[in-house]
From Swiss-Prot:
Belongs to the CheB family. HAMAP family: CheB_chemtxs. It comes from Shewanella sp. (strain MR-7). Its EC number is 3.1.1.61, 3.5.1.44. Phosphorylated by CheA. Phosphorylation of the N-terminal regulatory domain activates the methylesterase activity. Residues 156-348 form the CheB-type methylesterase domain. GO terms for biological process: chemotaxis. One of its GO terms (molecular function) is protein-glutamate methylesterase activity. Signal peptide: none annotated. NCBIfam families: PRK00742.1, PRK12555.1. PANTHER family: PROTEIN-GLUTAMATE METHYLESTERASE/PROTEIN-GLUTAMINE GLUTAMINASE, PROTEIN-GLUTAMATE METHYLESTERASE_PROTEIN-GLUTAMINE GLUTAMINASE. This is Protein-glutamate methylesterase/protein-glutamine glutaminase 2. The gene is cheB2.
Length: 351
């Protein structure tokens, strides 16, 4: 069965470009191209697409309004096409909160290599979206519990442990849900979420507003502090190194690892090497296998490993690969994951 795709974009150039890319893939079937939300609504009813690529900025009815109506009337897998601006990034995260599966920046095709890389990426995202769990099909997010109901962590744990998290498709909302359940006082948290440049700073700012923790985009060479969360910048690997008695960040422009930059494997490998048994790591929703090798090293070094359960994942790819390797100690659905991680940290020897 081919995957039926509807392209919705007010730019004829983008519509035709995406249409040609989709038509060139035998696994996909282009069922229509719409220039605005009104045309799109008719085509959704007529063709019942499996996946919709949706421009955020459209005339008459904008992409967010259309997405909200679509998710209420006929939930469908949607990949947002987003502009590389601060406003575009904000709108993208609002779209993901409304139920969009994934997003991709608008193409900047300055060379044949750019075209080929963009084509590979958009086709991969469309195929992944077709097999994703929609918001209505996933385990409900946890209700945020007040800090007084959370187990207290000892000063030793807060100052010696390191929490590492990796995610891809569906990860922005999963990370938000997880961090919202953490208390304000935590060991340093480092996160790699697959995301292009131009979006990670806005993502960090969003998390900073919506959680009790201090969240920021990681900078090179900064000391990791308790109560802070550090997000890997787009197109840069985030590593943790130990300098003296302190954990510090290192950002690099190395080759893609497991197909990604930033890579979860790069982060997890570095944390395993410098924090060892003082590592608590979680691998969340995402396609592919990035993070499985790193989880194996964390397990080998004596760290504690968690994976998000299938029922709450948008795409159960990265967790599945790590679980298959036999290196995950606890498989937990997202609503219960924060409590499981906190209970483990609270159980460690007190000072």
């Amino acid at each position: 069965m081919t995957i039926k795709v509807l392209v919705v974009d007010d730019s004829a150039l983008i519509r035709n470009l995406l249409g040609k890319m989709i038509e060139a893939d035998s696994e996909l079937s282009l069922v229509g191209m719409a220039a605005d939300a009104y045309m799109a609504k008719d085509m959704v009813n007529q063709h019942r697409p499996d996946v919709i690529t949706l421009d955020i900025e459209m005339p008459k009815v904008d992409g967010l309004t259309f997405l909200d109506r679509l998710m209420k009337a006929r939930p469908t897998a949607v990949v947002m096409i987003s502009s590389l601006t601060e406003e575009g990034a904000d709108a993208t995260f609002n779209a993901l909160a409304l139920g969009a599966v994934d997003f991709i920046p608008k193409p900047k095709l300055d060379s044949p290599q750019d075209f080929n890389e963009y084509q590979d990426l958009i086709l991969e995202k469309i195929k992944s979206a077709a097999h994703a769990k929609l918001k209505t099909q996933r385990a409900a997010p946890a209700v945020v519990v007040q800090p007084s109901h959370k187990p207290a962590l000892s000063n030793r744990v807060i100052n010696t442990q390191l929490v590492a998290i990796g995610a891809s498709t569906g990860g922005t909302e999963a990370i938000l849900s997880l961090l919202q359940q953490f208390p304000a006082v935590m060991p340093p948290i480092v996160i790699t979420q697959h995301m292009p440049p131009g979006f990670t700073r806005t993502f960090a700012e969003r998390l900073n507003k919506l959680t009790r923790l201090n969240v920021k985009q990681a900078e090179d060479g900064e000391r990791l502090l308790p109560c802070y969360v550090y997000i890997a910048p787009g197109d840069q690997h985030l590593e943790v190194i130990k300098v003296g008695g302190s954990f510090k960040t290192r950002l690099t422009q190395g080759d893609k690892v497991s197909g990604h930059r930033p890579s979860v494997d790069v982060l997890f490998n570095s944390v395993a090497e410098c924090a060892g048994a003082n590592t608590t790591a979680a691998i969340l929703t995402g396609m592919g296998k990035d993070g499985a090798d790193g989880m194996a090293l964390i397990d080998e070094q004596g760290g504690k490993t968690f994976a998000q359960g299938e029922q709450s994942c948008v795409v159960f790819g990265m967790p599945r690969e790590a679980i298959k390797r036999g290196v995950i100690h606890h498989v937990v659905e997202l609503p219960q994951l924060a409590d499981k991680m906190l209970n483990y940290l609270a159980s460690l020897k007190r000072d």
